[in-house]
């Protein structure tokens, strides 16, 4: 016989029992909610008008029927909106959707519950089919109808529910068949779904944020120009410093070429101390204009205009002219100062002060940038500094600019960017922030997560077909699609890749076609259309006579330009929605790996990301939720990545994905040349001479497919 427990043991056991009593227990479990980023720490991104696909695993004990709904709230909404979720047996998962019809910050969450009436109704139906007695079940149904009547404020619904309860319990005057018929009636089911309150309603503990941006954040063609170089090139004469009016004269041609955004490097007064000369010389001449990234002198800082460009009124006129042509102006937002910037005298503590009292200039050893002082965004007076940096953005928004290309954000405190972007977009949700961060992938991803609308990419250094395939697959078919919008710039004032240096004009045409068809966001810097490819020295990515340090007027219509390519490709992008999406990109086999072959599908797949794994929403569910509009066109793109030699291959067409039978011929039309080809089956022949064309952009002509059948 075991010993009697000591009193102390008994007391401890009782205390333990009290401690283990649950304060609150949820009968229904909601988990694996999508979309969400890092457990809800950061918002996911969408574009206004998008239908957001939502998913969740909803679990409980037993076999009762469950119900679930998406709760969403848009900007300035006073209350939550609910939309039902649908259950898929095969994936054992719930799916829902809602449309984000305004820009700004949205939030959503999931609610789930035991659907008592649906559970009761299903059991009743099974017992009726089995010929079992259901009198007690009908009484239970009557009780639920009365409960629902007490919770509704709709008089007609209350009356109908009370009448139903009476009918279900009426054994004397109502035939059993009629009572059963009413119990299983679809109208009653709908009524109960609306008015019977769940007894175990469970809400997912987090509200997930979605940042909804305007359309230009997803699809746009960017063009970078220095206003000071937009003058006429006169042989034998020194170049004249351009103005905003000179730059405005170029806008009609840029609009004609199909660009959407005109991006300007810094337009502020340029420092004089340690001013850089031509080709980054440390010994400038008297007429050298300096680098516009050395911001500020006695004429002002980040909220001032370089007088050589014009006045603030001239800038306002330039912005207005651009808008009148369907173009938007983007400004460079570079948080750094020249030694002559007003802030250096007014707030020396906003910079890194060395032990000898001097201010630390920018450097990336062994490189030195004596003309630039970095700001110390983690200084003791950072609240005032952060406010001043925010006010710069707000100032230019006041002058019609709502797109900012941010210079080297990875060298500033991440917490600052999350704060300043949130501050600006709270008041001006239409504002776009573009991160110019060529750094480690995790740092680039972090900037995108914390708020940057779009980001530069490694595209410039991805030139072989396998590199492009691998990198673009990461951008478009990984969890990065929830937060990272890559803008594929083909060149920048800092980056002239050797592919362009050694590949000549055909290489420029190849890179243009790739960037503009692989991504809805792409851009170029002035001179690309002229195939400028002379580096300052062999092996360098710096341009000779770099426009960063001197005036570079050009004749943009000189022989050998690729303007016709630009206009045609941008026209294709605008006319066909398939080139305005990301996730509809898929790569397919080319038996010659030098030729890259890919498809831009007529619609984006409905995919949810659970961790690093994709979960495709079942087609029937997606269609019921409003996805799957197949009204667009399918495109097949073949590009020769070798700019020197003719290449030929057999490409493997994904005909089954496009709904084309194995033995059916189909017509593809090249939108670059207007040539038509009749293909059959999966394997088809492609030959590309880079001196004639960089590739094909095939439109699959579905009417022709039907005619050939």
Where are these regions (language model features)?
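Carbohydrate-interacting/catalytic domains
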Residues: 1-228, 232, 236-260, 269, ...
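Glycine-rich, phosphate-binding/catalytic loops in enzymes
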Residues: 125-126, 279-282, 346-347, 421-423, ...
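Aromatic- and glycine-enriched glycan-recognition loops and surfaces
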Residues: 228-331, 385-388, 417-418, 505, ...
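Alpha-amylase-like alpha-glycosidases and glucanotransferases acting on alpha-linked glucans and related
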Residues: 292-320, 324-327, 337-564, 581-582, ...
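Residues immediately flanking
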Residues: 333, 437, 492, 640-641, ...
